[in-house]
Amino acid sequence: MKHIVKHIHFVGIGGAGMSGIAEVLVNLGYQVSGSDLARNAVTERLEALGARVSIGHDAANIEGANAVVVSTAVRSDNPEVLAARRLRVPIVPRAVMLAELMRLKQGIAIAGTHGKTTTTSLVASVLAAGGLDPTFVIGGRLTSAGANARLGMGDFIVAEADESDASFLNLYPVIEVITNIDADHMDTYGHDFARLKQAFIEFTQRLPFYGSAVVCIDDANVRQIVPLISKPVVRYGFAADAQVRAENVEARDGRMHFTVRREGREPLPVVLNLPGLHNVQNALAAIAIATDLDVADAAIQQALAEFNGVGRRFQRYGEIAAAGGGAYTLIDDYGHHPVEMAATIAAARGAFPGRRLVLAFQPHRYTRTRDCFDDFVNVLSTVDALVLTEVYAAGEAPISTANGDALSRALRAAGKVEPVFVATVDEVPDALAKLARDGDVVITMGAGSIGGVPGKLAQDTQQKG
């Protein structure tokens, strides 16, 4: 690619999916430029590495580019896209550029509706501990690396495979993981769940004859497609027929302790530095891959025990001063689908037994709120206190029957929790100040702008201290 394409431009370079690819390309020696609507820590990091970042979208930004990379979030009337068309500069979907990176190494692609980012991070961490020095591209900031991407010198590249826009079908890895299959982003599949499952089957057909599909057999929908997968399958989970299985699982001090059973191997005791049964499953995927690649058991154990997490995935911000005295424990999480939210809430209950759980939640997308409305009511009703914001639109038109007010009214009617509704995320800190008490566990949750709230709360506590 490099003898023809030397300068690559990213429209929306600050996004989680785009920035990682951009960073790897910078480190490979390409000239990288990009644009976004605002500066953030990611764009500043890319600039420090040598990328040229413009704030705002303008046709002039693509000057000299041999290719323009876009995600599905970029509109067709974006001025940089229009300029690329006019100048006949190739417009490359993000997933196609990721596929090009995978051609340079042996790809390990992590797919599934939930758990992709954490699983990708665990796989990368375990392979790194085993001396394989992988390249990785992750949808969140891996704490130990201080970034969401890294160019390694080893043979493997570990990356998330996105089913939300069916772009994972552009990838041709040698190992695939399927964590679960759930109803989300159903507009991509014509609101036909059978089409979604078929897409995952087609994903496995991208594997070479020597490849393998590593699948969570605990998930009912994954179990249904296993007989239809024509390539070698490795099953992981808690189920009796899992080839990589967790037993004797116990939550202690915010960690998960368990024993791994693998066919033909000695039992492996593991301490995972993450809470929650769902994270045990994510770790099993990493263990299955590491075992296949002959990573030493001691390296697996060390990587999982020392895993420092991923940004916005059960990210702990420490103790925050409560308005009435004392302090509460603050956690931030990216969860935005009821299944993810339930897993995070269960993990918090397990990590902090007996403590009052306060949730500040910003729904993400009106269509998701509409499609999962009853499930949102059910999962939000399981917390002890709730701050609820208006829906983060993500470019969608409002739906009056699926907005924050409608969700609040449904929660009150259910009668299990009394939501405190605020119109904007800016009002969340004040609402939490009135609600959170000494000893509480407070979780800020959502895929939108609520991600900026915990940093503000932590900063306010430091200033007061």
UniProtKB/Swiss-Prot annotation:
InterPro entries the record matches: Mur-like_cat_sf, Mur_ligase_C, Mur_ligase_C_dom_sf, Mur_ligase_cen, Mur_ligase_N, MurCDEF_pg_biosynth, UDP-N-AcMur_Ala_ligase_MurC
GO molecular function list: ATP binding; UDP-N-acetylmuramate-L-alanine ligase activity
Gene Ontology biological process terms from the UniProt entry: cell division; cell wall organization; peptidoglycan biosynthetic process; regulation of cell shape
Pfam family, one: Mur_ligase_C
Protein localization: Cytoplasm
Residues that, per the record, bind ATP: 112-118
Stored SUPFAM superfamilies: MurCD N-terminal domain, MurD-like peptide ligases, catalytic domain, MurD-like peptide ligases, peptide-binding domain
Alphabetical keyword list: ATP-binding, Cell cycle, Cell division, Cell shape, Cell wall biogenesis/degradation, Cytoplasm, Ligase, Nucleotide-binding, Peptidoglycan synthesis
UniProt pathway annotation: Cell wall biogenesis; peptidoglycan biosynthesis
GO cellular component, as recorded: cytoplasm
Signal sequence range: none
Record field: catalytic activity: UDP-N-acetyl-alpha-D-muramate + L-alanine + ATP = UDP-N-acetyl-alpha-D-muramoyl-L-alanine + ADP + phosphate + H(+)
Membrane-spanning parts: none
EC assignment: 6.3.2.8
PANTHER family referenced in this protein's UniProt entry, alphabetically: UDP-N-ACETYLMURAMATE--L-ALANINE LIGASE, UDP-N-ACETYLMURAMATE--L-ALANINE LIGASE-RELATED
Alphabetized HAMAP family for the sequence: MurC
Function of the protein: Cell wall formation.
Family recorded in the similarity comment: Belongs to the MurCDEF family.
NCBIfam families: murC
UniProt protein name: UDP-N-acetylmuramate--L-alanine ligase
Gene field: murC
